[in-house]
Amino acid sequence: MQKQHQRQHKVELVANLKSQFADAKALLICDYKGLSVRKLEALRNKARNQGIKVQVIKNTLAHIAMKETGYSDLDLKETNVFLWGGDQIALSKLVFDFQKEHKDHFVLKAGLFDKESVSVAHVEAVSKLPSKEELMGMLLSVWTAPARYFVTGLDNLRKAKEEN
């Protein structure tokens, strides 16, 4: 009876993972050997604030969920923590920032963007891109620059006329 209950639990877990992986734009797999529970919980809290999921999943269950969701095939070995979400840049930044703080205990092993395998170097390059909010700020600055220069020019013209 207990084996049947365990099997049912695994089937439900795989179904839940499939639905979450299907919506994810990015999925990163990291080695977390030697990382304390407290530090892993800190990562989860940072991720939760950004809408990113963090979960330690058995490789066989993750493999089944990924395969049934259409992700490219990965050879999963050893202990892994899976991170996924809808924003590739935010997820990449989170992983590489956390990796810098915990070099010996947290390493990116594999990445999948839009269900296709990408190299660790690719994920690192994406982590260096500006976030959506930063890009919007840059764009807004570019759009307002002509008006700002026009107003500054008018103000300088007014000051020049007042001096004469």
Swiss-Prot record:
Keywords: Ribonucleoprotein, Ribosomal protein, RNA-binding, rRNA-binding
Pfam families hit by this protein: Ribosomal_L10
UniProt GO cellular component terms: cytosolic large ribosomal subunit
GO biological process, one term: translation
Subunit structure of this chain's protein: Part of the ribosomal stalk of the 50S ribosomal subunit. The N-terminus interacts with L11 and the large rRNA to form the base of the stalk. The C-terminus forms an elongated spine to which L12 dimers bind in a sequential fashion forming a multimeric L10(L12)X complex.
Similarity comment: Belongs to the universal ribosomal protein uL10 family.
Its biological purpose: Forms part of the ribosomal stalk, playing a central role in the interaction of the ribosome with GTP-bound translation factors.
Name by which UniProt lists this protein: Large ribosomal subunit protein uL10
